[in-house]
Amino acid sequence: FTFLSEMIKKFKEVFPKARVSMYEAQLSSFLPAIRDGRLDFAIGTLSDEMLLQDLHVEPLFESEFVLVASKSRTCTGSTTLASLTHEQWVMPQTDMGYYKELLTTLQDNHISIENIVQTDSVVTIYNLVLNADYLTVIPRDMIAPFGSDQFIVLPVEDELPVARYAAVWSKNYRIKKSASVLVELAKQYSSLDSERRR
């Protein structure tokens, strides 16, 4: 998120005593906890294969996926995924959604699963790209973590999907007032962020 810090700061002004817990993983791994009421809501990327009929889905924003490398790598024009079979990759761990599609796309381009490290940690992804010369595919909005300019987008001829982000919560449980405000702030700040990118 490029707007997370502003959103949480505003939320804590409105609800200074609210307890906030944040977890990092793919949306698909949070769905059971949302369905049984252990989580108030989650924000993540949607995919057509997710069964969400029993959930409220509030679309937030879209972000195109891009091929990302360390700035230390030289970039000489566009490339293809098939020309990157010898590279080491790091990708988010998931069994559904865009990253599963991306994993299939990489394998269709003869990138071996043995060359792909999978993790739920975005910090680990950034670390491997920055310090071990790995490649990754992430939403464009995530290429400058913590204000860093250490990552570059490698132009790729292959078509990569667009990530559709949404807030998701159960229809079977009444969403808490504080959680509802946080979802509204996510809508507000993601809209402002989208306008800034235009």
Language model region names:
Residues 1-15, 19-23, 28-32, 174:
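N-terminal winged-helix
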Residues 1-3, 75-76, 87-109, 175-183, ...:
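Secondary-structure junction motif
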Residues 6-10, 27-65, 69, 152-154:
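Short beta-strand-centered segments that line the small-molecule binding cleft or hinge
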Residues 14-15, 100, 140-148, 158-198:
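C-terminal effector-binding regulatory domain of bacterial HTH transcription factors
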Residues 26-39, 45, 95-152:
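Hydrophobic hinge/microswitch elements
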Residues 31-32, 58, 82, 126-127, ...:
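Alpha-helical segments flanking ligand/cofactor-binding loops in enzyme cores
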Residues 51-58, 63, 123-172:
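Beta-alpha-beta core module
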Residues 55-89:
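Flexible hinge/capping segments at coil-to-helix
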